[in-house]
Curated annotation (Swiss-Prot):
Protein name: Nicotinate phosphoribosyltransferase
Posttranslational mods: Transiently phosphorylated on a His residue during the reaction cycle. Phosphorylation strongly increases the affinity for substrates and increases the rate of nicotinate D-ribonucleotide production. Dephosphorylation regenerates the low-affinity form of the enzyme, leading to product release.
Gene Ontology molecular function: nicotinate phosphoribosyltransferase activity
Catalytic activity entry: nicotinate + 5-phospho-alpha-D-ribose 1-diphosphate + ATP + H2O = nicotinate beta-D-ribonucleotide + ADP + phosphate + diphosphate
EC number: 6.3.4.21
Length: 401
């Protein structure tokens, strides 16, 4: 299938902010670390038929470079150091790092190489897969249809919140990875900027730059996964990851992701020093109400006022779920809502893809993600899962994918 040969990705900044934020930390601290990542389709979609077209699109990515205007934009932000940005100017995607196959109808993708380079593949590659598939399945869909759907949801949102003080409600666009298309995401976020006063930013650097809104994002599971092999001891790997992040970003980007090895294990490592230093926590699996209560209780046990901290909710959210969480928590702790697929691929008759790319190896050794939702568990090596479970005193883990 090669109907759409024109490049879908046209800028290096069409990615999520946390990828550049993590890449800078890897560039400074783990320059020679190597990793392998793999694609997973959590649904039943047989996506192998798109392999040839994806190979062509991946080849196109080798020509993407940071433009002078984009360099100036990144230089104006408080996150980046000059040595990293100068290196990023020289960065080129290397398609030889990516193996794409159609295995009996299933799409198989494996990415291997230096972490500082591999780290940038995940988000644009997922966006690419999503857009290629939706172009074939729903060629008639336009950005206007997505905006029409959004506007009806915003009317429903007004009705849901008419009795609420919304002054503390904040929304972020997290829609890049599973969007219908770049044009749909841009149209949706543009509409939110115009019609939704609670929008505070986008995870997509290109869209944030175009619309003059804040780029948002800190770190992903891979930051914690890689430290399972970078850290000299497995028991200390989460603390090592948390400390390395603070060393790179001592006074900003202070939201920590909690569910790489379950939230309970994370909170045991998230002691007073980390809890004071970090601005807050991000939820990405498991029951969000239960998680939020655990987080508040943890801060209270450490004699930290929860109202001085922030919880970011980002797991399979829509506006209705966000309102429910806001009602429950907003008077006790600051809350922000990151909504992805339900903004950038919420179109009648369109089924979003449930796809991910996750680390499976670091320096040739296994890493794992054992989240608060067993269906999201990822690891090849059962012995390593057992070692991780023992190191963090976890209950029996359901079958890894």
């Amino acid at each position: 299938m090669t109907r759409h040969a024109a490049p879908i990705l046209t800028t290096l900044l069409d990615t999520d902010a946390y990828k550049l934020h993590m890449q800078q930390a890897v560039f400074h601290r783990y320059y020679d670390v190597t990793v392998t990542a793999e694609f997973r389709c959590r649904g039943e979609d047989m996506l192998g038929i798109y392999a040839d077209e994806l190979v062509q699109q991946i080849a196109n990515m080798a020509s993407l470079t940071l433009t002078d205007n984009e360099f100036a934009y990144l230089s104006s932000l408080p996150f980046f150091k000059t040595d990293y940005l100068n290196w990023l100017r020289t960065f080129r995607y290397n398609p030889e790092q990516v193996t794409v196959q159609n295995l009996q109808g299933k799409l198989d993708i494996r990415i291997s190489g230096p972490w500082r380079e591999v780290i940038l593949w995940e988000v644009p590659l997922l966006a690419l897969i999503s857009e290629v598939v939706h172009r074939h399945r729903s060629p008639q869909i336009t950005p206007e249809q997505a905006v029409s759907r959004l506007k009806s949801k915003l009317e429903q949102f007004k009705r849901l919140t008419c009795d609420l003080d919304m002054s503390r409600f904040r929304l972020m666009d997290f829609g890049t990875r599973r969007r219908f298309s770049h044009d749909v995401q841009l149209a949706v976020v543009s509409t939110l900027k115009q019609d939704f006063p609670w929008l505070v930013g986008s995870s997509n650097y290109d869209i944030a730059r175009r619309l003059n809104i804040a780029p948002v994002g800190t770190q992903a599971h891979e930051w914690f996964q890689a430290h399972q092999q970078i850290s000299p001891t497995l028991e200390n790997c989460q603390r090592a990851a948390l400390q390395a992040w603070l060393d790179e970003y001592p006074d900003r980007l202070g939201i920590a992701l909690t569910d790489c090895i379950t939230t309970d294990a994370f909170l045991r490592d998230f002691g007073s020093e980390f809890a004071h230093a970090y601005q807050g926590l991000r939820h990405d699996s498991g029951d969000p109400f239960e998680w939020g209560e655990k987080a508040i209780a943890h801060y209270q046990q450490l004699n930290i006022d929860p109202l001085s901290k922030t919880l970011v909710f980002s797991d399979n959210l829509d506006l209705d779920k966000a309102v429910g969480l806001y009602r429950h928590f907003e008077q006790r702790i600051n809350v922000i809502f990151g909504i992805g697929t339900r903004l950038s691929c919420d179109i009648p008759q369109v089924k979003p893809l449930n796809i991910v790319i996750k680390l499976v190896e670091c320096n040739g050794k296994p890493v794992a993600k054992l989240s608060d939702s067993p269906g999201k568990t990822i690891c090849h090596d059962k012995a390593f899962v057992r070692a991780l479970r023992k190191a963090f005193d976890l209950p029996r883990v359901k079958k890894a994918s």
